[in-house]
Amino acid sequence: MKRIVLSVVVASLAALAPPAPAQTPATGRLMREKLAHTQRILEALTTSNYDLLARESVALSQVASAPGWTVLKMPEYRRHSEEFLRVAEDLAAAARDRDLDLAATRFGALTMSCYQCHKYIKNMRLAR
């Protein structure tokens, strides 16, 4: 009987515990850095600033390669992360080639990659 009561108490305390934070402080910094680079890429595309486009595209790829980027070890998250890095590298290649139309297309794919990953993480948390 004591075990049952103890189990109920432990389960109740676990249920009352605050949920795990949505992201670590390091991941939050990387996401804000990613957002800043993405905003500057949009600026570069809309102003035809090839140098800014190339610089920010490379910087964005570097953010996605940082160790703090892959904090979750789930296969689906890894797939989203690899897709983001691939598209970011494609964007950097279009920037090097000074192809604004292709860069704009890659930027759209990059945005969808972000959206799909954030949607996955949100749905995963809601399912808990």
Residue spans for each PLM region:
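Positively charged n-region of N-terminal signal peptides that target proteins for export
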Residues: 1-4
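N-terminal signal peptide c-region/cleavage motif recognized by signal peptidases
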Residues: 17-19
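General helical structural elements
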Residues: 6-7, 36
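Bacterial N-terminal signal peptides
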Residues: 7-15
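Sequence context surrounding c-type heme c attachment/ligation sites in exported
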Residues: 23-128
